Amino acid sequence: VDQEEKDNEQYQRKLFRDYVLRKNDHLEIRRELKRRFDAGAELTGPKGLRKQLAAFDLGYFGRAYLKHYFVRPSPSFHEELDEIWTKGVLKGRNPAMDAKKISRLDGSKNVVAAPRGHAKSTNFTFKDSLHAALYLYKHYIIILSDSSDQAEGFLSDIKTEMEDNQEIRLDFGNQQGKVWK
């Protein structure tokens, strides 16, 4: 095991400890995940604790799987964006257990306005679309942007993460798609 892998494992363990009990939503599940973590349960892999916590904690999902995008401390505004997705799309449900139910729920209509550079697209278009695809609660994700080039860029970034991101591959398996458009 090289130093980079050791550093990543240390990062992932600290991140899990920092996030598992940080909020009160899904509190029973959070407590059980913490108990299992303390007992030495596997953090990674298809049944790992990371995948289970990231199912309903979008802030954790971004930092655990997309740490190269979420490098600085997030402003509270990003928590508000996550809350919009959690309430509007997930309806407070846990996609690890309720993906099929979530996929059949009515959608939501929300408008978010913020200045350029506030990571609205990074959160909604990129992170949350990737989350929906990996946890299988949205089957047809539409990406709208100022231009087709910008939308294609987001799709390309999502494709790259699904196919090449080692953390995603470790927990979700091979996500290589046949057609991307």
Enumerate the language-model features and the residues they cover:
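A structural signal for short, well-ordered beta-strand segments and their strand-loop junctions
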Residues: 111, 142-145
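Catalytic micro-motifs at enzyme active sites that drive phosphoryl/nucleotidyl and oxygen chemistry
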Residues: 115, 130-132, 175-181
